[in-house]
Amino acid sequence: MYAIVVYDVGERRVAKVCKYLRTVLQWMQNSVFEGELTGAQIERVKSRLATLIDPEEDAILIYLVSDEKWVRREAMGIEKNFRSNLL
């Protein structure tokens, strides 16, 4: 499953959330990560993120799509992490 994670997290917790997400997904731009995950991995990510945030102050959205080909991405302005198929 293809996952897109976006977050708005308090200053004291943002570095921990970002550092963790970098271990499981690809950084796209500020507060946005995406990548392919299995169902079990998605559950682990959700569980870990729940320990890192304050649910009274922070917000995380996880968009799940069955396949990346169904995601249509349009960028405006500079792309902070340009993805390329070149090796």
Spans of model-derived segments:
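Short, intrinsically disordered low-complexity segments
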Residues: N30-A59, L64
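Extended, hydrophobic alpha-helical segments
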Residues: M1-Q41
